Amino acid sequence: MKKTIFQQLFLSVCALTVALPCSAQSPETSGKEFTLEQLMPGGKEFYNFYPEYVVGLQWMGDNYVFIEGDDLVFNKANGKSAQTTRFSAADLNALMPEGCKFQTTDAFPSFRTLDAGRGLVVLFTQGGLVGFDMLARKVTYLFDTNEETASLDFSPVGDRVAYVRNHNLYIARGGKLGEGMSRAIAVTIDGTETLVYGQAVHQREFGIEKGTFWSPKGSCLAFYRMDQSMVKPTPIVDYHPLEAESKPLYYPMAGTPSHHVTVGIYHLATGKTVYLQTGEPKEKFLTNLSWSPDENILYVAEVNRAQNECKVNAYDAETGRFVRTLFVETDKHYVEPLHPLTFLPGSNNQFIWQSRRDGWNHLYLYDTTGRLIRQVTKGEWEVTNFAGFDPKGTRLYFESTEASPLERHFYCIDIKGGKTKDLTPESGMHRTQLSPDGSAIIDIFQSPTVPRKVTVTNIGKGSHTLLEAKNPDTGYAMPEIRTGTIMAADGQTPLYYKLTMPLHFDPAKKYPVIVYVYGGPHAQLVTKTWRSSVGGWDIYMAQKGYAVFTVDSRGSANRGAAFEQVIHRRLGQTEMADQMCGVDFLKSQSWVDADRIGVHGWSYGGFMTTNLMLTHGDVFKVGVAGGPVIDWNRYEIMYGERYFDAPQENPEGYDAANLLKRAGDLKGRLMLIHGAIDPVVVWQHSLLFLDACVKARTYPDYYVYPSHEHNVMGPDRVHLYETITRYFTDHL
C-alpha cells in the first residue's frame, strides 16, 4: 500500500525521535510473583497489596478526624504532636435511641463532616443517617432513607438534607430524638423520566458533579431542572429478568437536539420557588453555580452550544431576574469552565475565578462588577486545585504543576501577586486538604519510591506524620520501571513515558511489547506516584515476559491549552502520530521484538486502540479495545462537540474519525470488549463495528459484560483482565 504524504512526513519526524535521559526503578527479581487477585481492584487480596491509607480522613475546623479500627479518632492539629480523642461504635450505640443501634461490626460506620465549627458529623447507617455532635457527645437528629433516596446534599448548618426520589426533589429536616422522623417537604411534584430535578446535568461535563446547591446560610436551595423530552432515548436493556427489560437513556448525540436545563431557587422561609430567567436559546449549558455570601445573588457560568463562549452572569435570588454579565470569555477552539466563583473571606464583592485564557489554568481576582483586579498566578504551568485562603484572607493556597507536569505541590501566594512559595518541596505527588480556617493542611504524598505518607502540618508551626505506609510489594518480585521523555511528532514537544520491563529481563533476548494508550483530554497516565504510576496489570504482564509502554501524547491533561487543543476538530490524528513516535522509540531498543507489538486501551483509549489497529496494521499484531468510541456522531453533545464541533460544522473531521468506514482495513487480531449497559459509550458503537466488519469480511473478536456499564468494576474486573491477558498470550 502506498504511503500518503502525511505518513511520509510523519515517518521522517519519528526517525529523528530520540529518548532523552531516563530514570529507572531497580527491579527486585527474587521473591514470589503476584496474582491478578492481588494486583487488580476488586481482587480478593487487592487491599493487602495496596499502600496503607487513613480511612475517612477529613477536616473539622482545625481538627481532623478519621477511622482507626472500631474507633472514630478526633485529633487537634497543633504542630508536631496530636491531641487525640476516640469514640467507639459501642460509645455511639449507648447514645442511640431504641431500635437505632449500629450493627455489631469491626468497622466503624462511614461518615462525613458537616459543620466545621460545631463538630457535627453524619454517620451512614442501615436505614438512615445519624447526626452526631462530637464536641457535645450526643446524637442530635435522625434522617430516614431508603434505596430510592439519591443525591443527598446537607445544608451548611447540617439540620436539613436535600435529596432526590423518583425524579423529584425533597428537603427533610432531621427528627429530634424521641419525636420520630419529620416529614419531608416536596420541592417539586411533576418529575418524570423526561423531567428530572436536583440531579447533575449536561452529562456531568464542565465540572458538574451534583444538582443541588445550598446558599451559605442554608436559607435557599438552588437546583437543576432538566427537560429531556426533546432527546430521543437510547434503550439500555437489562437481560437478567425472564423477560428482558428496556430502560430509556436520554443521551443527546452530537448534532441532535440537546436537553433544556433551567435553575430553580427554593426559599425555605416562604416555600416559594423562582426560576432564573436565563432566556434564549434554551440549548446552552448552565454550569458552575455559586452563591454570593449574602445569599442575594446566584452566579452562573453560561456556555453556548458551540462551546466557544462563556458568560459569567449574575441573577437575583429573590426574583430570578438577570442582573448583569460580569465578563465574557471566548476561545477559537473551546472554553471549558470547571470551577465556580470563590469569594474572599469576609468579602461580598471580590472573588477568585479560574481560567485558561493565557494558555494555562490560573487564578484571577475579580470584583462583582466584572472588573479584573489582577491575575494572581502566572507561568507556563497549571493550577490543578485551588484550595482556599489563609486565616486573614490575604494569601491563596493551591496545587500546581509548577515543579513538573509529573508532580503536584502545594503553594501559597499573596493575593496581591508575587512569587509562589512551595510548602511541600519533596519531589512527587502531593494531594492536599486545607483546613476550613486555612491554618493547616493534610498532605497525602506519594513518589515512585514512597507508597504513601500522610502528614498534618500547621502552616508555619510544624508537622505531625500520621502515616508512613510500608512497601506492600516486599517479598515479591518486581520488574524494572523506566521513565523518560521522547519527542512528539511535531519535533519539538517532549512527551513523558513509562516503561515496565519484563521480569528477569535479559538484554540479549527479544521481548514483545504492549502499548497501553488513552491519549484523550482529562487524563494523565504518567506521574511521579507510587511505582511511577505503573498499574497492576502492567506488573502482571511483566511477570509473563511482556514489556508495557505508555506515553502521554498531545491531547492529554495538565500540559496547558495548546498541548490539549491541538486535537480540536481532528480527534485521533495528532494523538496517533505521537503514539507512533513512541513505537518508533520502542523499535530502536535492541531487545524489542518489532514483530510482536500490541496495543490496549479503554474508552478514548479504546477508540485509539481500534484506530491504531486499522491505520497501522503492519505494526500492531494484536489489540484489545474496551468500551471504544467508534463513530463520534453517536457520542454525546457536551464532550463530542467540544472537541469536534457539531457534525454539521465539521463533517470532514467526523468522517476521518469514523472507524465504521474503515472496518475493512483490519489486519491483526483485535478484540473489542463492551459493557452491555454502558451509558457513556453506548453499546451501539461496538455492535455497529461488528456489523461493518461482517460486511467487509474482516474478523475481530468480541466480549460482552452483560451486567456492567462503561467500566467493569468490582470482582469481575479480575475476570476482565484475565480475559485480556489470555488474548495477548494466545496471539502476541
UniProtKB/Swiss-Prot annotation:
It comes from the Bacteria. It holds the Pfam family Peptidase_S9. The active site is at S603 (charge relay system), D678 (charge relay system), H710 (charge relay system). InterPro entries: AB_hydrolase_fold, Peptidase_S9_cat, Peptidase_S9B_N, Serine_Prot_S9B/DPPIV. Strongly inhibited by diisopropyl fluorophosphate and Pefabloc. Weakly inhibited by 3,4-dichloroisocumarin. Not inhibited by phenylmethylsulfonyl fluoride, leupeptin, antipain or prolinal. Activated by iodoacetamide. Optimum pH is 6-8. Keywords: Aminopeptidase, Hydrolase, Protease, Serine protease, Signal. GO terms for biological process: proteolysis. Serine proteinase. Releases tripeptides from the free amino terminus of proteins. Has a requirement for Pro in the P1 position, but is inactivated by Pro in the P1' position. This is Prolyl tripeptidyl peptidase. It comes from Porphyromonas gingivalis (strain ATCC BAA-308 / W83).
